[in-house]
């Protein structure tokens, strides 16, 4: 079986930026992650064994001088000490537990220092997705010529409509070749003539390097959720924004606000943070309703929302992005992160619906116990975590069922 992940930076930028801030602010924090397959997929016999071998192979994946040089050029906000850390970073199989039950369902857990395990999630999700297509024989049905042409058509529509967008598709891509093909098609289309819109780049750092594009991304829910587990959800957004400011000093200024819902975020989003952060990312809820909440919040602070960026990344496709662009452009500087719609859009192939969520955290290895955490989505009924933990967090935040 071929090795699926061969490059250290074949990963989303926000895993690296969060890793940097974790070391800077919570260097001794310990965490647990858990894999969730929302489709309850039955995996082929022996899948867990092969996935285990793929994870063990990560121990030989080390960052290269070329990757470091690229990040120094394109990610100038990263402090130089972080590149020294990455040079010495080594994956360990000891952080990961993989099993497959009698019904064929897959179970994956990570546990360890937050600064270590944070770089596993996206790589392991990409492994699971590609490995599933390999072991079920579907990989042979991936038509990359068709994907390239289809992606060019999508890009033409987005660019003509004035959309500013990026590829966000690493975690659930059909294969590395699929994402590489998509980014090549996006770049070729963008460079073919002048457009009303703009291709910003890709979340995948390695693919950004090979295509000489900007790597994009800031943070994921786990950053706020882990802090919520350690300190409680009421002030988690405040602590997260403060930690981000401490590390990046205003750079990487798009904040993902929906880890514990809009209401508590809004209470934490004071005028200094609203001025510091370039904008916000909408990743759940009704896009129009969420945008109107953001606009109203900025106005209440005396800030013109038209000067602020709003990144939409909530299960977008070409049609929904263009629709949002039409109404959002009058209220903000809209941009779009498009994932599976780009990197896993093949005839007769069902994209996987898989996530790995941070489920518990503790501030130091000295503590004898972890504190559970969860995510409270703006989509009703889509909270993630143990039911009793969700109830406890909702009670703490005075949220209604």
Per-segment meaning from a language model:
Residues 1-236, 245, 357-401:
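Ordered alpha/beta subdomains of enzyme catalytic regions
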